[in-house]
Protein backbone atom coordinates (compact mmCIF):
# COMPACT_ATOMS: atom_id res chain seq x y z
CA UNK A 1 0.00 0.00 0.00
CA UNK A 2 2.83 2.39 0.87
CA UNK A 3 4.48 1.81 -2.50
CA UNK A 4 1.13 2.38 -4.21
CA UNK A 5 0.64 5.69 -2.42
CA UNK A 6 4.16 6.82 -3.28
CA UNK A 7 3.59 5.93 -6.92
CA UNK A 8 0.26 7.75 -6.94
CA UNK A 9 1.86 10.84 -5.42
CA UNK A 10 4.61 10.82 -8.04
CA UNK A 11 2.02 10.36 -10.78
CA UNK A 12 0.05 13.43 -9.64
CA UNK A 13 3.00 15.66 -8.72
CA UNK A 14 3.64 18.78 -10.84
CA UNK A 15 6.03 18.01 -13.70
CA UNK A 16 7.88 21.32 -13.51
CA UNK A 17 9.72 21.94 -10.27
CA UNK A 18 11.57 24.84 -8.70
CA UNK A 19 14.63 22.66 -8.10
CA UNK A 20 14.91 21.74 -11.78
CA UNK A 21 14.26 25.35 -12.76
CA UNK A 22 17.06 26.52 -10.48
CA UNK A 23 19.40 23.94 -12.00
CA UNK A 24 18.63 25.20 -15.50
CA UNK A 25 19.22 28.78 -14.39
CA UNK A 26 22.56 27.76 -12.87
CA UNK A 27 23.72 26.71 -16.34
CA UNK A 28 23.29 30.32 -17.53
CA UNK A 29 21.32 29.67 -20.71
CA UNK A 30 21.04 32.51 -23.21
CA UNK A 31 17.25 32.37 -22.76
CA UNK A 32 15.04 33.11 -19.75
CA UNK A 33 13.71 30.09 -17.86
CA UNK A 34 10.70 29.97 -15.57
CA UNK A 35 7.56 27.94 -14.90
CA UNK A 36 5.08 29.09 -17.56
CA UNK A 37 1.56 29.83 -16.41
CA UNK A 38 0.32 27.31 -18.99
CA UNK A 39 2.09 24.48 -17.15
CA UNK A 40 1.51 25.43 -13.51
CA UNK A 41 0.40 22.34 -11.59
CA UNK A 42 0.31 20.03 -14.61
CA UNK A 43 1.57 16.48 -14.19
CA UNK A 44 4.14 14.85 -16.42
CA UNK A 45 1.43 12.89 -18.24
CA UNK A 46 -0.59 16.04 -18.85
CA UNK A 47 2.41 17.80 -20.37
CA UNK A 48 3.44 14.72 -22.33
CA UNK A 49 0.00 14.69 -23.96
CA UNK A 50 1.02 17.86 -25.83
CA UNK A 51 3.83 16.03 -27.61
CA UNK A 52 4.20 13.11 -29.97
CA UNK A 53 6.81 10.34 -30.09
CA UNK A 54 10.10 11.41 -31.68
CA UNK A 55 9.63 8.63 -34.22
CA UNK A 56 7.18 10.93 -36.00
CA UNK A 57 10.08 13.29 -36.74
CA UNK A 58 11.91 10.76 -38.88
CA UNK A 59 12.51 12.38 -42.24
CA UNK A 60 11.30 10.61 -45.36
CA UNK A 61 13.26 12.35 -48.09
CA UNK A 62 11.11 10.84 -50.84
CA UNK A 63 7.76 11.76 -49.31
CA UNK A 64 7.70 15.48 -50.15
CA UNK A 65 9.45 17.01 -53.20
CA UNK A 66 12.36 19.33 -52.56
CA UNK A 67 11.50 23.00 -52.76
CA UNK A 68 13.51 25.40 -54.92
CA UNK A 69 13.85 29.15 -54.52
CA UNK A 70 15.32 31.89 -56.68
CA UNK A 71 19.00 32.70 -56.39
CA UNK A 72 18.36 36.18 -54.97
CA UNK A 73 19.29 36.63 -51.33
CA UNK A 74 16.64 36.59 -48.62
CA UNK A 75 16.15 39.76 -46.55
CA UNK A 76 18.12 39.98 -43.30
CA UNK A 77 14.94 39.52 -41.28
CA UNK A 78 11.30 38.67 -41.81
CA UNK A 79 8.40 38.58 -39.35
CA UNK A 80 5.05 37.54 -40.78
CA UNK A 81 3.28 39.12 -37.81
CA UNK A 82 4.65 42.54 -38.72
CA UNK A 83 4.58 42.25 -42.50
CA UNK A 84 1.08 40.73 -42.73
CA UNK A 85 -0.71 41.53 -39.46
CA UNK A 86 -4.12 41.06 -41.10
CA UNK A 87 -3.23 37.46 -41.98
CA UNK A 88 -2.30 35.88 -38.68
CA UNK A 89 -4.94 34.77 -36.14
CA UNK A 90 -4.44 34.57 -32.40
CA UNK A 91 -2.39 31.83 -30.77
CA UNK A 92 -4.52 28.79 -29.97
CA UNK A 93 -4.19 25.91 -27.52
CA UNK A 94 -4.23 22.28 -28.64
CA UNK A 95 -5.29 21.14 -25.15
CA UNK A 96 -4.73 17.58 -23.96
CA UNK A 97 -4.12 16.05 -27.37
CA UNK A 98 -0.91 15.50 -29.33
CA UNK A 99 -2.44 17.22 -32.35
CA UNK A 100 0.38 19.72 -32.90
CA UNK A 101 0.90 18.23 -36.37
CA UNK A 102 -2.66 19.19 -37.35
CA UNK A 103 -2.58 22.63 -35.70
CA UNK A 104 0.69 23.66 -37.32
CA UNK A 105 -0.32 22.39 -40.74
CA UNK A 106 -3.63 24.26 -40.86
CA UNK A 107 -1.96 27.35 -39.37
CA UNK A 108 0.43 27.31 -42.31
CA UNK A 109 -2.51 26.78 -44.69
CA UNK A 110 -4.22 29.92 -43.41
CA UNK A 111 -1.05 31.99 -43.30
CA UNK A 112 0.05 31.07 -46.81
CA UNK A 113 -3.39 31.45 -48.37
CA UNK A 114 -3.62 34.96 -46.93
CA UNK A 115 -0.05 35.73 -48.04
CA UNK A 116 -1.04 34.72 -51.59
CA UNK A 117 -4.12 36.94 -51.49
CA UNK A 118 -6.60 34.06 -51.61
CA UNK A 119 -7.98 35.10 -48.22
CA UNK A 120 -8.30 38.82 -47.53
CA UNK A 121 -8.01 38.39 -43.77
CA UNK A 122 -6.94 35.76 -41.26
CA UNK A 123 -9.03 32.61 -41.55
CA UNK A 124 -8.81 29.82 -39.00
CA UNK A 125 -8.85 26.46 -40.71
CA UNK A 126 -9.98 23.36 -38.87
CA UNK A 127 -7.41 21.19 -37.10
CA UNK A 128 -10.31 19.05 -35.89
CA UNK A 129 -11.29 18.08 -39.42
CA UNK A 130 -7.70 16.98 -40.04
CA UNK A 131 -7.45 15.09 -36.73
CA UNK A 132 -10.75 13.29 -37.34
CA UNK A 133 -10.48 12.59 -41.07
CA UNK A 134 -6.77 12.04 -41.78
CA UNK A 135 -6.47 8.29 -41.25
CA UNK A 136 -2.83 8.32 -42.34
CA UNK A 137 -1.91 9.95 -39.04
CA UNK A 138 -2.52 9.06 -35.42
CA UNK A 139 -4.83 11.81 -34.15
CA UNK A 140 -3.94 12.67 -30.53
CA UNK A 141 -0.96 10.31 -30.62
CA UNK A 142 0.89 12.31 -33.28
CA UNK A 143 1.34 12.64 -37.01
CA UNK A 144 3.95 12.75 -39.76
CA UNK A 145 4.47 16.03 -41.59
CA UNK A 146 4.63 14.45 -45.08
CA UNK A 147 1.50 12.45 -44.32
CA UNK A 148 -0.61 15.43 -43.26
CA UNK A 149 0.40 17.34 -46.39
CA UNK A 150 -0.58 14.34 -48.48
CA UNK A 151 -3.99 14.60 -46.83
CA UNK A 152 -4.17 18.36 -47.38
CA UNK A 153 -3.39 18.00 -51.08
CA UNK A 154 -5.78 15.10 -51.68
CA UNK A 155 -8.64 16.01 -49.33
CA UNK A 156 -8.08 19.41 -47.72
CA UNK A 157 -9.76 20.91 -44.68
CA UNK A 158 -12.65 23.18 -43.85
CA UNK A 159 -12.86 26.18 -41.53
CA UNK A 160 -12.72 26.07 -37.76
CA UNK A 161 -16.09 27.80 -37.71
CA UNK A 162 -17.60 24.82 -39.52
CA UNK A 163 -15.79 22.11 -37.54
CA UNK A 164 -14.54 23.54 -34.21
CA UNK A 165 -11.86 21.85 -32.15
CA UNK A 166 -12.94 19.22 -29.59
CA UNK A 167 -10.10 16.72 -29.28
CA UNK A 168 -8.25 18.93 -26.81
CA UNK A 169 -10.91 18.17 -24.20
CA UNK A 170 -11.85 14.64 -25.28
CA UNK A 171 -8.35 13.34 -26.07
CA UNK A 172 -9.91 11.35 -28.92
CA UNK A 173 -9.95 11.45 -32.72
CA UNK A 174 -13.70 11.74 -33.05
CA UNK A 175 -15.79 10.87 -36.10
CA UNK A 176 -14.93 12.43 -39.45
CA UNK A 177 -17.76 14.96 -39.89
CA UNK A 178 -20.01 15.03 -42.93
CA UNK A 179 -21.68 18.28 -41.87
CA UNK A 180 -20.72 21.43 -40.00
CA UNK A 181 -21.31 21.58 -36.26
CA UNK A 182 -24.47 23.65 -36.83
CA UNK A 183 -25.93 20.97 -39.11
CA UNK A 184 -25.28 22.80 -42.37
CA UNK A 185 -23.51 21.15 -45.28
CA UNK A 186 -19.73 21.15 -45.34
CA UNK A 187 -18.56 24.06 -47.48
CA UNK A 188 -15.73 23.94 -49.99
CA UNK A 189 -12.72 21.95 -48.75
CA UNK A 190 -9.53 23.93 -49.09
CA UNK A 191 -6.76 21.87 -50.68
CA UNK A 192 -3.10 22.52 -51.34
CA UNK A 193 -2.09 22.08 -54.97
CA UNK A 194 1.30 20.81 -53.82
CA UNK A 195 3.69 20.80 -50.86
CA UNK A 196 7.47 21.08 -50.90
CA UNK A 197 10.23 20.57 -48.33
CA UNK A 198 12.97 23.16 -47.79
CA UNK A 199 14.57 21.23 -44.92
CA UNK A 200 18.30 21.25 -44.17
CA UNK A 201 18.83 24.41 -46.25
CA UNK A 202 18.56 27.42 -43.95
CA UNK A 203 19.02 30.07 -46.69
CA UNK A 204 16.27 28.40 -48.74
CA UNK A 205 14.00 28.29 -45.68
CA UNK A 206 14.55 32.02 -45.16
CA UNK A 207 13.78 32.82 -48.78
CA UNK A 208 10.71 30.58 -48.76
CA UNK A 209 9.36 32.34 -45.66
CA UNK A 210 9.89 35.81 -47.09
CA UNK A 211 8.40 34.98 -50.50
CA UNK A 212 5.63 32.53 -49.63
CA UNK A 213 4.77 32.84 -45.96
CA UNK A 214 4.97 30.59 -42.87
CA UNK A 215 6.08 26.97 -43.02
CA UNK A 216 5.38 23.88 -40.95
CA UNK A 217 8.32 22.38 -39.10
CA UNK A 218 8.99 20.05 -36.18
CA UNK A 219 11.70 19.50 -33.60
CA UNK A 220 12.85 17.39 -30.68
CA UNK A 221 11.64 18.67 -27.31
CA UNK A 222 13.95 18.36 -24.32
CA UNK A 223 12.80 18.83 -20.73
CA UNK A 224 14.39 22.30 -20.44
CA UNK A 225 12.16 23.60 -23.25
CA UNK A 226 9.13 23.28 -20.99
CA UNK A 227 10.67 26.00 -18.81
CA UNK A 228 11.10 28.44 -21.69
CA UNK A 229 9.78 31.96 -21.05
CA UNK A 230 11.60 34.24 -23.47
CA UNK A 231 14.78 34.78 -25.46
CA UNK A 232 16.48 32.66 -28.09
CA UNK A 233 16.19 29.02 -27.04
CA UNK A 234 19.12 26.65 -27.27
CA UNK A 235 19.03 23.20 -25.69
CA UNK A 236 20.86 23.41 -22.38
CA UNK A 237 19.81 20.52 -20.18
CA UNK A 238 17.56 17.49 -19.90
CA UNK A 239 16.34 14.42 -21.65
CA UNK A 240 14.22 13.96 -24.75
CA UNK A 241 10.52 14.36 -23.94
CA UNK A 242 9.05 13.93 -27.42
CA UNK A 243 8.53 15.60 -30.75
CA UNK A 244 6.50 18.70 -31.57
CA UNK A 245 5.27 20.31 -34.79
CA UNK A 246 4.96 24.09 -35.06
CA UNK A 247 4.40 27.02 -37.43
CA UNK A 248 7.59 28.86 -38.48
CA UNK A 249 6.65 32.50 -39.14
CA UNK A 250 9.92 34.36 -39.51
CA UNK A 251 13.54 34.91 -38.59
CA UNK A 252 15.89 37.60 -37.33
CA UNK A 253 18.99 38.42 -35.30
CA UNK A 254 19.01 39.68 -31.70
CA UNK A 255 21.08 42.49 -30.21
CA UNK A 256 23.88 40.06 -29.38
CA UNK A 257 24.15 38.92 -32.98
CA UNK A 258 22.39 35.60 -32.38
CA UNK A 259 20.39 34.39 -35.40
CA UNK A 260 16.99 32.89 -34.64
CA UNK A 261 13.79 31.50 -36.11
CA UNK A 262 10.41 32.85 -34.95
CA UNK A 263 7.97 30.06 -34.14
CA UNK A 264 4.25 30.12 -33.41
CA UNK A 265 3.35 27.41 -30.91
CA UNK A 266 -0.04 25.85 -30.10
CA UNK A 267 0.11 25.95 -26.31
CA UNK A 268 -1.91 29.14 -25.90
CA UNK A 269 -0.76 32.70 -25.13
CA UNK A 270 0.24 31.87 -21.53
CA UNK A 271 3.40 30.13 -22.68
CA UNK A 272 6.61 31.64 -24.03
CA UNK A 273 6.60 35.02 -25.73
CA UNK A 274 2.80 35.40 -25.90
CA UNK A 275 2.56 31.93 -27.40
CA UNK A 276 5.63 32.25 -29.63
CA UNK A 277 9.26 31.32 -29.15
CA UNK A 278 12.58 31.96 -30.82
CA UNK A 279 15.19 29.29 -31.42
CA UNK A 280 18.78 29.35 -32.70
CA UNK A 281 18.96 29.57 -36.50
CA UNK A 282 21.44 28.06 -38.99
CA UNK A 283 22.55 25.13 -36.80
CA UNK A 284 19.51 22.82 -37.07
CA UNK A 285 18.97 23.23 -33.33
CA UNK A 286 16.92 20.30 -32.00
CA UNK A 287 16.19 19.35 -35.62
CA UNK A 288 14.14 22.51 -36.26
CA UNK A 289 15.54 22.78 -39.81
CA UNK A 290 15.18 19.08 -40.62
CA UNK A 291 11.69 19.07 -42.16
CA UNK A 292 10.31 22.46 -43.21
CA UNK A 293 7.28 22.15 -45.45
CA UNK A 294 5.23 24.72 -47.32
CA UNK A 295 1.98 24.23 -49.18
CA UNK A 296 0.88 26.08 -52.31
CA UNK A 297 -2.68 27.08 -53.17
CA UNK A 298 -4.66 28.30 -56.17
CA UNK A 299 -8.21 28.73 -54.90
Swiss-Prot record:
Pfam families: Peptidase_C1 (PF00112). Residues 1-19 form the signal peptide. InterPro entries: Papain-like_cys_pep_sf (IPR038765), Pept_asp_AS (IPR025661), Pept_cys_AS (IPR000169), Pept_his_AS (IPR025660), Peptidase_C1A (IPR013128), Peptidase_C1A_C (IPR000668). GO terms for biological process: proteolysis. Disulfide bonds join 87-114, 97-140, 133-176. It is found in: Vacuole. One of its GO terms (cellular component) is vacuole. Its EC number is 3.4.22.-. GO terms for molecular function: cysteine-type peptidase activity. Its main location: other. Keywords: Disulfide bond, Hydrolase, Protease, Signal, Thiol protease, Vacuole, Zymogen. The active site is at residues 100, 244, 265. Gene3D superfamilies: Cysteine proteinases. It is an enzyme of class 3 (hydrolase). Thiol protease which is required for parasite excystation and invasion of the proximal small intestine of the human host. Belongs to the peptidase C1 family. This is Cathepsin B-like CP3. It comes from Giardia intestinalis. The gene is CP3.
Amino acid sequence: MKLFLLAAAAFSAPALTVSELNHIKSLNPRWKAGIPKRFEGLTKDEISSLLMPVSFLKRDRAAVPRGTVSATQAPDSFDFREEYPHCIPEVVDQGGCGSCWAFSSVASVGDRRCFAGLDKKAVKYSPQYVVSCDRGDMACDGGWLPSVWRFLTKTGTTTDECVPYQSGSTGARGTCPTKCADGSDLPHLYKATKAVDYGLDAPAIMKALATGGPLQTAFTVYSDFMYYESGVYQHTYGRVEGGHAVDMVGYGTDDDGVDYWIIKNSWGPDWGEDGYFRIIRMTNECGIEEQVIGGFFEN
